[in-house]
Structures are given as structure tokens and as C-alpha cells.
Amino acid sequence: MKRKLLATLLTAAMTASLLAGCAAPAAGTAAAAPEASSEATEEAAAPAEGEKIKIGCSIWSSTDALGSQCKQILDAAAEAVGAEVQYVDTGFVADQVTASVEQLAAAGCQGIIICNSADSEMALATQTCNDNKVYLAQFFRVVSEENSPEIYKMVKESPYFIGAVHEDEIENGKELIRILTEEQGRRNIGLIGWVQGDATWLGRWEGYKQGIEAWNEAHPDDPATLSEPQYAGTSSDGGRQAAEALMSADPDTDALIAAGGNGNPLQGTIAAVEGAGKVGEIAIVSTDFIPELGERLADGSMAAESGGHYCDPLFAFMMVYNAIKGNYTVSTDSFEEIIFPYIFVASKEDYDNYAQYFVDELPYTQEELKAMSELSIEDLAKEAAIHSLADVQKRHAK
């Protein structure tokens, strides 16, 4: 059985819409996993004395709202431990995701962290790392045993696949529905996805559906509805068009969920609601914090958002770094799994408190990052478990 190093995710603090911080089961039927190379059983050579460790990062974008924050914390971690990070932006295009792993391996990276889109991409990614003796870990993602059993078996048996850091997207989706139905009193909810089949999107969608089912079971005389998704891609214009389509199809729409897409579809959704003159009348919730979130919560153009999880790839980086150093043993019958917590905010005060410790400064100092690099895998998981506004406030009290 897969070994799970679970971080506390949606605690009582989540109910208070704060003090709680992409992914989920992957898309449908995945491509069959290629057979492992016979060379993959050989261990990678540890870096020579004084040799600088180089870790590759395959990411959808290192420049958008979430991606740039991920890059900032990864660059800080690399500086703290004397390593180097090389980035390849993929746009979540399948061919570019798999090609990025080949590119990073060819560039001499001893390890790679990857945010893939679908499980199918992990077959070639893992095979490439096996063939090149390069360590691999996922961030914002985990391969689904249920949906992709062959690929799950492949990564589990790989001597170079260390594990995955991801969020519990089903619980995230359920909590956003709870906020809309219980706290906001909304009943006609329109849903905006980003890319069909994206692993994280599917997890959140399942959470939204479970949240609606739970509400309706408890309140049969006051049911809530959730529309079929309109897809926005990852652009602001796509978000605007999707929101306009939902409002046109159901004039009684009183809430919109911009499920993700790293902030851009949310911006378009807000613009569409503003253009329709329905700010406040239609409550908007989303995942992935945007820079002006505090102002949006203050003026009523947003009701709540989950996010603050940009340190997720930091923990994948630390897993790969320690595997390269020879400090972590990679199992060939399981993989490490760290579930990372979200932070939920529902007011400008909530966001201002968050921004003080996560935007105006990083949640970890250089000294703390260096100390983190020396943790065992068990203690690294414990460190992820306590990641929250309260934890950072305690460590960086002002």
C-alpha cells in the first residue's frame, strides 16, 4: 500500500475561513505505461564533492500569478542550499510537458519536479527519468491509482520517482460549496472549469458535486443546483466568455465558481459580472490567489477564495534535493505522498493578514529553508502539515 504522509488539510480553522493554506485524481483512461528500462535499476551517482546540484522544474508558467510565486520560493530554496533551478514553461500542453522532461534531463539536471496536466504524461516523464537516472517528484499533482493503474504501478516501481506533493482538491471543492450555500445563501451556482481532463480540475469538480449533494441531502426543501461546466482555458477572455454564457443560460444564477486556471479565468469572470452590473448579486469564489484579492473581497466582487499553496513545489524540491544527495532512499514498491493544506480567506482582513506573511515576505527565511533541507522525509511531511498563517505568524512574530 502506498505510504501516505498526510498533512492536516481542512481543519476547524477552515470553518472560520482562515488558518487553513493543485491535485487530484487524473483524467479518465490514461495511456498504457511503457515497460521500465533495464537500466533503471541502477542508482544515480551522487554529486561529486563541491558539484552544484541542478534541479529542473517543469511548470505550466513561471510568470503568472501562482507560477511566479512558486518560482520565487524555489529560487530562495536553491539559494539557501547552494543549488540551481532551471525552468521550462509548458502551458499544460501534453507534448510540451513530456518534452520538458527530456529537455531538462538533457540539460544535466540531476532531479526534476513536475506539474503535469494529466496522468498520461507521467508515463513518458517517468521513463525519461528512469533512462537518464534523474530523480522525479510531482507538485500540485499525484497519479491516480483508480484512473491510471498502469501508470500508478510504473511510478510506484520506479527507482527514480520519489513521490508527490498535492492538495486534497475534493475537500477544497466541498468547502467552497459550503461557503456559498451555508455562509452566502446561494442556490443557483454556475461552474467554470479551465481545461477538460486536467487532473486538478477533475478533483475540484468532484468536490463541488459532493458539496451540492451534501447540502441537498441536509436541506431537501431548499436545494442548490450546480451547472454543467463551461470551459475557459487559462485566459481572462475565456473566463469572461464562460461567465457570460452561464449568466445568459440561467438568469437566476446567483454564484459563480471560477475553478482555477491560475487566476486568469477568474479575472475574466469578475469582469463579466461587473459588466452585467451584478457585483454582489452574484457571489464569486475561486482557487489560486490573485494579487488584488484583498480589494476584490472588500468591494464585494469576490466572496471567498482558497489558495496560499505556492509552497507546495518547495516540498517536492526538498524531496528531490535529498534524493540527489543520497539522504532519501527511493522505494520501488511505494512512493512518498505529502498532502499540502490550503488557506481560505473570505474578507479583506483575512487577506491582509495573509499578505503580510506570504506576499510582503516569504513564509520561510534562508535559515529555515536550509534547516528544512536537512529534515527526514517524515519530518518534511510534518513541516508541510503545519503550514498555515498561524505557523508563519508564530515563527516570524513582529
Q: Where in this protein do the model-derived segments appear?
A:
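Positively charged n-region of N-terminal signal peptides that target proteins for export
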Residues: 1-12
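C-terminal motif of bacterial Sec signal peptides marking the signal peptidase cleavage site
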Residues: 17-21
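A residue-level marker of the well-folded mature domains of exported/periplasmic proteins
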Residues: 22-398
